[in-house]
Amino acid sequence: MTFEVGVVGAGAWGTALAQMLSSDGREVLLWARESEVVREINEDRRNGPFLPSACLNPTITATADLADMARIPVLLLVTPAQHLASVLGGIGRDGGDVVLCSKGIEAGTGRLMADVARDAAPDASIAVLSGPTFAHEVADGLPTAVTLACAGGEEQWLRLSTAIARPTFRPYYSDDVTGAEIGGAVKNVLAIACGVVEGLRLGQNARAALISRGFAEMQRFGLALGARPKTLSGLSGLGDLVLTCSSTSSRNFSLGKALGEGASATAVMADRATVAEGAFTAPVLADLARGRGISMPIVEAVVTLLEGAAPAREVVAGLLSRPLTAENPLV
């Protein structure tokens, strides 16, 4: 069997992407780490642990062998950000397109995912898919738009859009890979903060203010690293931020909500099968911002909460007591 597209990672998002990509009858190969997940997908057309609501299309084939993914022309990488290097390196990718669908910053190195991927697969053409997406809605065929940022420019975009676009899944072209990555990584951290506001029952005014001020932090950080303002105000930045900061369907938002209700980050994350990437991104992001002299008080507050260094109400009170200043400066 010949596969045009492969998806590496059978969590909720990876499975949803495989479901969307196979919606027109195309064959899609989906890699899962767990042998039981592979069996369930192939035999029962289900992925109970990660996307139980979906009846999976018959043209999805699951495998537990990374080597099966090596020669597929287009690979979508949907593994947790902290495992991207080891998984992509294990595939032994030689050329082809690699589309990064995980949002985060590598702990210990501070590298964005595209830099990690270039080291792990130096001959591959890298792109980033990012935007306002909930896995269950994509799997259900509801309309979705994303940014597809291509390091290879329009030539790569034309190749990938043919492979990825579907009637209900619309990718928009960009060549600002850095901007697309930063938007997704930072919004995960800000979603935790918005969840805290929900957990503390501070109201919609507070949430709207936090989204706006959080977006200012995203802009400051992104512009310092070379992102374009239009990218940050697009689907992969502001669009993703608004969605993720408004619903408990977001793993990061629900983590923050639990923190606001008094739970510890350690306890919440130990009880989950899925990953809230913002919890891993927050301390790395804060370190990078400090090193560049970038003010990100909301991100710093999230780190304080994740470390359990202060109660949620005290942390929020600290944000509210900061010196008054102008709204718009990005410095």
Curated annotation (Swiss-Prot):
Give the EC class as a word.
oxidoreductase
UniProt: sn-glycerol 3-phosphate binding residues: 103, 131, 133, 187, 240, 250-252
Among InterPro entries, the record links this protein to:
6-PGluconate_DH-like_C_sf, 6PGD_dom2, G3P_DH_NAD-dep, G3P_DH_NAD-dep_C, G3P_DH_NAD-dep_N, NAD(P)-bd_dom_sf
Which Gene Ontology BP terms does the record give?
A: carbohydrate metabolic process; glycerol-3-phosphate biosynthetic process; glycerol-3-phosphate catabolic process; glycerophospholipid metabolic process; phospholipid biosynthetic process
Pathway assignment: Membrane lipid metabolism; glycerophospholipid metabolism
Quote the cellular component terms of the Gene Ontology held in the record. Answer: cytosol
Instruction: Return the protein name.
Output: Glycerol-3-phosphate dehydrogenase [NAD(P)+]
Species per Swiss-Prot/TrEMBL record: Novosphingobium aromaticivorans (strain ATCC 700278 / DSM 12444 / CCUG 56034 / CIP 105152 / NBRC 16084 / F199)
